[in-house]
């Protein structure tokens, strides 16, 4: 974060962007496109229930079509009385990649408009549940033309296997902020302008713990 980094948290409903430079948060943005729309694309394209589309995305999804094994197959449950059918993982990736590319392109637009694009020497850090999908790093580097990596919270105590992963980054950041607030002897919610301050400290924690 001293050299410059963009934190991109791809959640279910939104993609949150925070840009750091010189050890401080410089710009934030919220993009209303994220993992849920990827799931919706799969459900519509494959004509399968949303719940099954989510399972297919998590278990078999690839963000970059060229990386998916064309021989590997995934079972797609049908709607209503329709029988399930088989689909190649590469064809599935063909549904997913355009939406991920759109998300990354919007993030790139945010970075450019922020005026900090040239100072992101440390590149892009991806967090959130969707960031673990195979191919996200490779597609991100194609679009951003910068180093891209997943952010994993540093946690070595009990349940580390559960929480030391990108999808847990937001929860871990909020818990850490609550702990620090208690140590400081005040409640974050009672402080004037605390939401903006808490957001900044939360993002600072996330980047500092990868």
Residue ranges with predicted function:
Residues 12:
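Short, glycine/acidic-enriched loop or turn micro-motifs at the edges of active sites
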Residues 1-7, 16-210:
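Helical "lid/coupling" subdomains associated with nucleotide-phosphate turnover
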């Amino acid at each position: 974060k001293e050299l410059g980094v963009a934190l991109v948290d791809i959640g279910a409903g939104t993609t949150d962007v925070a840009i750091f430079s010189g050890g401080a948060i410089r710009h934030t943005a919220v993009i209303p496109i994220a993992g849920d729309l990827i799931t919706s694309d799969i459900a519509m394209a494959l004509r399968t229930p949303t719940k099954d589309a989510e399972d297919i995305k998590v278990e078999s999804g690839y963000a970059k079509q060229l990386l998916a094994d064309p021989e590997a197959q995934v079972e797609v449950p049908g709607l209503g009385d329709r029988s399930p059918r088989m689909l190649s993982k590469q064809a599935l990736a063909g549904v997913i990649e355009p939406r991920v590319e759109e998300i990354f392109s919007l993030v790139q637009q945010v970075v450019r408009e922020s005026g900090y694009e040239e100072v992101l020497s440390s590149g892009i850090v991806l967090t959130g549940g969707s960031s673990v999908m195979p191919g996200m790093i490779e597609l991100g580097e194609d679009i951003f033309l910068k180093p891209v990596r997943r952010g994993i919270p540093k946690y070595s105590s009990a349940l580390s296997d559960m929480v030391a992963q990108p999808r847990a980054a937001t929860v871990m950041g909020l818990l850490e902020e609550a702990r620090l607030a208690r140590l400081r002897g005040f409640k974050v919610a009672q402080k004037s302008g605390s939401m903006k301050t808490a957001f900044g400290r939360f993002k600072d924690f996330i980047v500092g713990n990868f």
